[in-house]
């Protein structure tokens, strides 16, 4: 489906109000993503094929795509797991002096990158994070919370988003 809202209207009324990913979160076996770049989409499709056809998992994927023309960068090294799990650092801040952490996904990510450039021009360091799936991050957080509760607090796994952002200021 085309994302809609931030650029051209989505394909079909269900995509024009921006809540299709919220609706997708209510379906337990729906894996939803809102990628920006071609390499993100490639990693997601490869993962989907592996899970659905090789591993025979009973899941399906809902992926929103964009309808704008823009340059797609090469995939940074080592981001595949982050793409699959829902978040990865796209751009490290130029300075470690309390950098701003900017998160974006889908159509808005490119504007987030522009905001980081503007902040850098004002001597404000900014890191950019691509959030490919808020739903997968939520699902992981809930699973960690559940495991902690079921173990009586003996196990306390850290959600992936916390692992990624905890060293950020």
Report residues per predicted region:
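Short active-site oxyanion
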Residues: 30-31
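Thiamine diphosphate
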Residues: 2, 6-15, 19, 25, ...
